[in-house]
Amino acid sequence: MGTVSVLYRERKAKFHTVLLDADQTLFDFNKSQRLSLKAALQKNGYPWNEEMNALYSKENLMVWKKFERGEITKERLKIERFENFFYKLGYKNADIAAVNADYIFHLSQCGFTIDDADTLCRALHGVCKLYIATNGIQSVQERRLEKSNIKPYIDGMFISDVLGCQKPAKEYFAFIFHTLQIADKSGVIILGDSLTSDMQG
């Protein structure tokens, strides 16, 4: 984020709109996931350790990539990640729906931001319009923004659940440009942690 901050300080006048990814660009998803998974598993009577967290991270990422490619729906994503997780742990009758519901609830309560995210947003506020562009689950994204220290600086949020298409599809960004009435795309910059999921469209 430090390098990005320098870039914006030097060139901020060139851009009028910044589209920011949510996870690991603004929000500390790794911390939020770890705490939420631990809480959800323990509430439902399952153990938790760092190895399990690493396994879930791997399975979750793989399923999200399938979603970004349009291979599965968001609802299927929520279930499949835990199906794969529990299968590899040897649990045959896990209450996946309950664990997923608790996981999503706890995730929505985590407004943790990464280092300097608030500094960046505060520096750009009033100079550029700041919008979050995310494939994340609507209830999670909206609630954790409310709990975060960056909310005062964010002008809006575009969530794939609401738009009906996801990053990096061209339709996703076309919807944003149409909604914001942006004709000159050269004044827009997209900031994220992944070329394939954030910017390729």
Describe every region a protein language model picked out.
Residues 8-22, 26-115:
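N-terminal helical cap/lid subdomain that shapes the substrate entry/recognition surface
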Residues 14-16, 128-129, 186-187:
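Short coil/turn segments at beta-strand junctions that form active-site/ligand-binding loops
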Residues 34-38, 148-150, 176:
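Glycine-rich, phosphate-binding/catalytic loops in enzymes
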Residues 94-95, 152-156, 184-188:
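Short acidic capping loops at alpha-helix termini that bridge into adjacent secondary structure
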Residues 98-101, 106-112, 117-148, 154-160, ...:
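Substrate-recognition element of Asp-dependent hydrolases with the DxDx(T/V) motif
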Residues 166-199:
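Conserved Lys-Pro-Asp/Glu-containing loop-to-beta segment of HAD-superfamily phosphomonoesterases
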